[in-house]
Amino acid sequence: MAKTVLRQYWDIPEGTECHRKTYATTSIGGAAGLVVSAYSVALKTPTSFLEGVARTGRYTFTAAAIGAIFGLTSCISAQVREKPDDPLNYLIGGCAGGLILGARTRSYGIGAAACAYMGLTAALVKMGQLEGWQVFAEPKV
């Protein structure tokens, strides 16, 4: 399942078709936010229906916005720098996504930490993809 979802992003060449990459990262982020919001509502039952809807929307739309900013920033960075397969593009995109999280929580500290962690994680994922690391290994039968 995760391979299929991520394939729609990885199949698009870096630095091209930014609108499709942004759509893919937005949908991946929105799906992740929906899963997190489902756990949030299930583990801490809201007092009213509207509180549950608000919490679901808050998590889902925040994660979708982070995904959209990541996809757009990393793609535009690849185009502007003319280095499509550089992990620095992903570091920039991850940092921009982290800053969105900091703005959403209205906290400079969370924004700075999320910028560093999301940027480094994204850069490591790109380095792993370039070097052939296997995140989802094929089972040996």
Swiss-Prot record:
One of its GO terms (biological process) is mitochondrial electron transport, NADH to ubiquinone. Its main location: mitochondrion. InterPro entries: NDUFA11. The modification N-acetylalanine is found at A2. The keyword Protein transport does not apply. The chain crosses the membrane at residues 22-43, 58-80. It is a multi-pass membrane protein. Keywords: Acetylation, Electron transport, Membrane, Mitochondrion, Mitochondrion inner membrane, Respiratory chain, Transmembrane, Transmembrane helix, Transport. It is found in: Mitochondrion inner membrane. It comes from the Eukaryota. One of its GO terms (cellular component) is respiratory chain complex I. Belongs to the complex I NDUFA11 subunit family. Accessory subunit of the mitochondrial membrane respiratory chain NADH dehydrogenase (Complex I), that is believed not to be involved in catalysis. Complex I functions in the transfer of electrons from NADH to the respiratory chain. The immediate electron acceptor for the enzyme is believed to be ubiquinone. Complex I is composed of 45 different subunits. This is NADH dehydrogenase [ubiquinone] 1 alpha subcomplex subunit 11. It comes from Bos taurus.
